[in-house]
């Protein structure tokens, strides 16, 4: 059997790929692997607003109860709430049922350990091994030893209180627009900003089970960009379906992506002496403009592979406090163990409030360099040709010399398709367009 777990848990089309049977098996195996067995284990379970969440929750909970563990159901809350509450409630593990920014027909199951971190590959593989073994040696308790389902009504309240406490300042006087993606932030974000005194204007906060992420939220911020200007707001925030990521919009309707948010927050935290080792953790896909801005502000950058799990690994290994991705996955490790959209939005709003500067002014710390991405079709067995072919290597060096430190060439093989992605950044859009297309053609020609 191929690997069940992807980069962010188990994901697939609900009821055909991610079936109730698979959810039951994951609940049963996960509860067995993630608990010590010396006490009655407690596992938190939450979901986003997808229609398939109820079906998968029922099956997952049944699996958890079948090995004698307690399932504590939190209802609809953001993914980062599960990470936070797993620690606060002293649970053995947490599970989120969500497919994040994906369309409604998809769903996913993601586990957190007792410290609120996503599982290691080894633990995920062990869960899969237990399922594939037919649950060999996994107990099937009876009578009083079966597990119980507990409904935790205070979960949302507890998470909102935590998020508000991360800024310690009133947001009175700020006009803030929120796009909740008809997802898990539709109560948490609205209540947090309102309770902190902001005047809020909300769109896409009416989930019906089928409209999550539908032309809204962080993957479609266009409506919010217009709405912020129309309502004369100081800023806006767009969340994805499970609210582990967030993008911002300034008062002029410009998108403020994860690179801008990271740079703004890093600069502010450094000034307060709260940016560990004056270092920001980013991925190779962050715009070169971020690197230049950080250099100007005397902020070090640690660069990882693409994926928030690699950002987190680097942060934990070195003790860094801030990291994230252009997509809006921002990790404030002093506050939470995973990307947290609401915490991110509140940090940005509090910086605007404390500095007295507009978001447009704050984002001027960084200038985005033009970026172009071209796909080159290559056979799966030739995805490293750019590292092996002498002519291609020479051409890349020539391009980098022409960009003269004000641009870069990055080639990334796709993990799922027979292609490599040729990315160039530089000051001249027309120049890098031509370079990228020429390099992609050269790579394709060498493969044929």
From Swiss-Prot:
Record has Magnesium as a keyword: yes
Cofactor note: Binds 1 Mg(2+) ion per subunit.
Modified residues (Phosphoserine): 100
Any GO BP: UDP-N-acetylglucosamine biosynthetic process
Sequence similarity: Belongs to the phosphohexose mutase family.
NCBIfam families: glmM, PRK10887.1
Positions contributing to Mg(2+) binding: 100, 240, 242, 244
Protein name: Phosphoglucosamine mutase
EC number: 5.4.2.10
């Amino acid at each position: 059997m191929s690997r069940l777990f992807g980069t962010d848990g188990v994901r697939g089309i609900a009821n055909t790929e991610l079936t109730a049977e698979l959810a039951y098996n994951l609940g049963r195996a996960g509860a067995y692997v993630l608990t010590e067995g010396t006490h009655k284990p407690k596992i938190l379970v939450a979901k986003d607003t997808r229609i398939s969440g109820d079906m998968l929750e029922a099956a997952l909970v049944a699996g958890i109860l079948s090995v004698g563990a307690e399932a504590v159901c939190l209802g609809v809350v953001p993914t980062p709430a599960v990470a936070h509450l797993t620690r606060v409630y002293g649970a053995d593990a947490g599970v989120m049922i969500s497919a994040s920014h994906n369309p409604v027909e998809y769903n996913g199951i993601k586990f957190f350990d007792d410290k609120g971190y996503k599982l290691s590959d080894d633990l995920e593989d062990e869960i899969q091994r237990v399922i594939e073994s037919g649950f060999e040696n996994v107990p099937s308790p009876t009578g009083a030893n079966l597990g119980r389902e507990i409904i935790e009504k205070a979960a949302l309240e507890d998470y909102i209180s935590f998020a508000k406490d991360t800024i310690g300042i009133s947001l009175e006087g700020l006009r803030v627009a929120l796009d909740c993606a008809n997802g898990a932030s539709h109560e948490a974000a609205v209540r947090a900003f309102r309770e902190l005194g902001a005047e809020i204007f909300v769109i896409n906060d009416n989930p019906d089970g089928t409209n999550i992420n539908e032309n809204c939220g962080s993957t479609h911020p266009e409506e919010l960009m217009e709405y912020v200007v129309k309502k004369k707001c100081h800023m806006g925030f767009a969340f994805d379906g499970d609210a582990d990521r967030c993008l911002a919009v300034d008062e002029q309707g410009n998108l403020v992506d994860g690179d801008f948010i990271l740079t703004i927050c890093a600069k502010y935290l450094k000034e307060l002496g709260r940016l560990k080792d004056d270092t920001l953790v980013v991925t190779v896909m962050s715009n070169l403009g971020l690197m230049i801005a950080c250099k100007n502000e005397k902020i070090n950058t640690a660069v990882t592979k693409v994926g928030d799990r690699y950002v987190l690994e680097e942060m934990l290994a070195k003790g860094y406090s801030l990291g994230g991705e252009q997509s809006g996955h921002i990790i404030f490790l002093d506050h939470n163990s995973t990307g947290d959209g609401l915490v991110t939005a509140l940090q940005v709003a509090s910086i605007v409030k404390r500095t007295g500067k507009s978001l447009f002014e704050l984002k001027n710390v960084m200038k985005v360099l033009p970026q172009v991405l071209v796909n080159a079709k290559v056979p799966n067995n030739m995805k490293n040709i750019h590292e092996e072919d002498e002519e291609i290597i020479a051409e890349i060096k020539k391009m980098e010399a022409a960009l003269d430190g004000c641009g870069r060439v990055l080639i990334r093989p796709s993990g799922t398709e027979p292609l490599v992605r040729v990315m160039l950044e530089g000051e001249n859009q027309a120049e890098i367009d031509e370079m990228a297309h020429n390099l992609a053609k050269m790579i394709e020609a060498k493969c044929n």
